Amino acid sequence: MTVVLRLPRELRPELRRPWGTLYPRPSIKTYRRLHEESEVLITVGDMTTRSFLRCSIRPDVAVVDRKMLRTVPVDPGNKFPVTLDVNNPPGTITREAWDTVRRGIDYALDGDATLIDVTGEEDLLAIPAILIAPENSIVCYGLPGEGMVAARVTQHLKDSVLRLLTRFRGYDEWKSRSWISGITPCCTAKR
């Protein structure tokens, strides 16, 4: 049986708060600075990924579902040497999606930019990206109607995100099985 973390309805407002700096209208200089300052640059979401690509900046890891606001197809092209496909239903983080984010970050640390193509919904995959990425990485994601958030990965941010994750449905089962599957809530990709 696959362990799935499910977002409870009561946590949705908390996820609307930015975990980093909110950029209502990022400039090309902002995109370049974020790229230069990051250990690993991870984008979650089609609009965010497309915005970096339009500035000729390829994220180290891009997580997309090829839709913007659930409707418009987005094609990141063939700009990524590695593409990983995964299913992740809306409002969830599956074990497979978590492991795929980890693999994508591992590829990026080895020098291979990776596109993670999600069937379903990618929105919540910023959570494993933050928990897995090495410190000083930057995870960028969109906040609908607000702009783009750039979250610099620190131990403090990882601790905050983990506290939120413990409130997801299925967390206790996931935590109890994580040693079997080789994943842990605060796992760090190889450096």
UniProtKB/Swiss-Prot annotation:
Pathway: Cofactor biosynthesis; coenzyme A biosynthesis. It catalyses: 3'-dephospho-CoA + GTP = GDP + CoA + H(+). Its EC number is 2.7.1.237. Pfam families: DUF359 (PF04019). The keyword GTP-binding applies. It comes from the Archaea. GO terms for molecular function: GTP binding; kinase activity. One of its GO terms (biological process) is coenzyme A biosynthetic process. GTP binds at D46, D65, K67, E122. Keywords: Coenzyme A biosynthesis, GTP-binding, Kinase, Nucleotide-binding, Transferase. It is an enzyme of class 2 (transferase). Transmembrane segments: none annotated. Coiled coil: none annotated. Catalyzes the GTP-dependent phosphorylation of the 3'-hydroxyl group of dephosphocoenzyme A to form coenzyme A (CoA). HAMAP family: Dephospho_CoA_kinase_GTP_dep (MF_00590). This is GTP-dependent dephospho-CoA kinase. It comes from Methanopyrus kandleri (strain AV19 / DSM 6324 / JCM 9639 / NBRC 100938).
